């Protein structure tokens, strides 16, 4: 089980979300059988989605992040509910690339830098909020930071990391997101900048055994922070047979008739959890009748 924690500075001028998403990234790797670099990329996006989901207010709100930079991984999608429970998938789960010039997994090379980060927030209005920003890095954390600055005009700092073992399992994963609130004083900004300049990578801190509280404290440097709340988080798919039936109906009567006339069972697989739903021609026919 992962964990997400919210904090605020004593003067209320900045807040930070910090998360341990090791179990979430590990579950994604188990479901999608990703290679090392795509595990790292998807794990980072899931962590970002979890923290952005936790920022939503309504119980039924959700956020969807879609990243496509033209790299060999293709599109990456992560969706989170308002409690920070994400799910996601990557179009091409197995990508093999040399390590980058720092000797690290080449997430930028897998994601690509020629494309956009799309953010869709469903907060119960008639139409969801949709924002998009050009990919500036492909490393994902910098792209999240840029999204908040450009699309939401909110000064932010995002850090994400996933450490993958030689056997492709996940050793640790997590991240933090700092946002400045209106009227944030220069001293606070300066203290955060100083801390961020010297902080180790998220995965280094997690691998050293630092807790989420300790990582948040390091990220905020000399600033004192108060814990607001703490939640367990997990990889969570909300697919059901009823949702799949609804999706089948959107294919239209003509296509459903073709499936029925083929006389064979069909299999519908959920992209997020790989669960398979089977439908016989008779069940499809009943579904079509009920829809009329």
Report each predicted region and the residues it spans.
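Cys/His-clustered metal-coordination modules, chiefly Zn-binding fingers
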Residues: 197-292
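Interaction interfaces in information-processing and related assembly proteins
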Residues: 1-229
